[in-house]
């Protein structure tokens, strides 16, 4: 979005952006000529508390690397270190750290957040939704990717980018490496790779694939014995809630 707006941002992210990878670069880092640096900060090692951003953005708080009370403490410090702090009002825990609800975003149409995504639809590998009467179409899948886009749009609007520019930019969005990445189709079976590793993310990845196929067979590769043991009950709860009778999940 910021590149489409002519801001030439620098980027440090986790996974590589497909468009940057196509340029022959590593994909998750790029130096731009503009004044903005976009960082995907990491709470897993606590290093996020060392950042003092102009704008801090929080999409969700879910049990992952630490217990919830530890995560709330870490993100509370991050909030205090941010000049402006924007949260997802549709996430129960994230909204508790709201600085100003009018700067926040939500996918709940009854929310009082300043930026609300409405009329979400997924047609195959494409999603669409509306924000303030502007229609957004993205070549991606899943409601969670609508929330990701909504978060980026909210921040962009805070620094002067209009919704039309945001919509135009997202029409050409090419995705991120191993984030709902379509690898191909064999004998009518779509193969999709996703790095989802905690209970909520795994459930979201499965739900995103369901409109594409009558049956989803998910293969889950845990990060290790410790994290799997730590999150076992949450995995069962979240994944069971989204599986249809015909769907399957396997662990390898």
Listing of model-derived features with the role each one plays in the protein:
Residues 4-7, 18-19, 23-26, 33-34, ...:
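Acidic, Mg2+-coordinating active-site environments of NTP-dependent enzymes
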Residues 178, 193-204:
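Glycine-rich phosphate/pyrophosphate-binding beta-alpha loops
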Residues 35-44, 191-197:
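Switch II (G3) loop of P-loop NTPases
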Residues 10-12, 38, 104:
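Short beta-strand "acidic-cap" motif of Rossmann-like dinucleotide-binding folds
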Residues 176, 207-252:
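Active-site beta-alpha connecting loops in nucleotide-dependent enzymes
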């Amino acid at each position: 979005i910021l590149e489409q707006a002519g801001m030439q941002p620098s980027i440090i992210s986790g996974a590589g952006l497909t468009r940057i990878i196509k340029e022959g670069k590593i994909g998750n880092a790029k130096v731009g000529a503009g004044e903005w640096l976009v960082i995907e900060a990491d709470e897993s090692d606590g290093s996020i508390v060392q950042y003092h951003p102009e704008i801090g953005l929080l999409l969700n708080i879910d049990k992952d690397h630490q217990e919830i009370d530890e995560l709330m403490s870490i993100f509370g410090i991050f909030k205090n270190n941010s000049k402006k702090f924007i949260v997802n009002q549709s996430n129960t825990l994230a909204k508790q750290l709201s600085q100003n609800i009018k700067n926040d975003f939500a996918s709940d149409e009854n929310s009082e957040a300043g930026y609300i995504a409405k009329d979400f639809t997924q047609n195959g590998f494409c999603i669409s939704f509306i924000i303030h009467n502007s229609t957004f179409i993205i070549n991606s899948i899943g409601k969670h990717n609508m929330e990701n886009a909504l978060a980026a749009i909210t921040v962009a609007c805070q620094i002067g980018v209009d919704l039309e520019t945001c919509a135009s930019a997202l029409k050409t969005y090419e995705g991120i490496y191993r984030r709902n990445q379509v690898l191909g189709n064999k004998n009518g079976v779509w193969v999709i790779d996703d790095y989802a590793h905690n209970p909520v993310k795994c459930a979201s990845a499965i739900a995103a694939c369901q409109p594409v196929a009558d049956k989803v067979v998910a293969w889950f590769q845990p990060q290790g014995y410790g994290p799997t043991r730590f999150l076992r009950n949450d995995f069962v709860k979240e994944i069971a809630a989204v599986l249809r009778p015909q769907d399957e999940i396997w662990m390898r």
